[in-house]
């Protein structure tokens, strides 16, 4: 089980990424625009650097919804491999069954 502070930190990162998504996209568009002046592009780089570090979506870590475990995350279900196996063995995941060949 992950610490509550780690789970809260991830929630904060998601909220910040949502809040600054449009602003970051706008600045990145200016930076990648070859027709923009060098000064405008440089100012956009500086503004992008001044945004909160956690507002970048790449800082987010996928975590299990039940335990907060960061490793062994199965994205289709939003669970770690351990909790996914437990749920599958209880028959709580429709269409998922134990492999047998």
From Swiss-Prot:
Coiled coil: none
Keywords, alphabetical: Ribonucleoprotein, Ribosomal protein, RNA-binding, rRNA-binding
Stretch list, region Disordered: 51-70
Ribosomal protein keyword on record: yes
One of the record's GO molecular function terms: rRNA binding
GO-annotated biological processes: translation
Top-level taxon of the source organism: Bacteria
GO cellular component: cytoplasm; small ribosomal subunit
HAMAP family tied to this protein: Ribosomal_uS14_1
Subunit structure: Part of the 30S ribosomal subunit. Contacts proteins S3 and S10.
UniProt-listed NCBIfam families: PRK08881.1
Family: Belongs to the universal ribosomal protein uS14 family.
Function according to Swiss-Prot or TrEMBL: Binds 16S rRNA, required for the assembly of 30S particles and may also be responsible for determining the conformation of the 16S rRNA at the A site.
This protein's name: Small ribosomal subunit protein uS14
Gene: rpsN
């Amino acid at each position: 089980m992950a610490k509550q502070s780690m789970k809260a930190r991830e929630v904060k990162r998601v909220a910040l990424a949502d809040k600054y998504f449009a602003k970051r996209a706008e600045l990145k568009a200016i930076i990648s625009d070859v027709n923009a002046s060098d000064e405008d592009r440089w100012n956009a780089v500086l503004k992008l650097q001044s945004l909160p570090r956690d507002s970048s979506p790449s800082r987010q870590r996928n975590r299990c919804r039940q335990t907060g475990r960061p490793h062994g995350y199965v994205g289709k279900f939003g669970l770690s491999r351990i909790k996914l196996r437990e749920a599958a063995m209880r028959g709580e995941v429709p269409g998922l069954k134990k492999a047998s060949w």
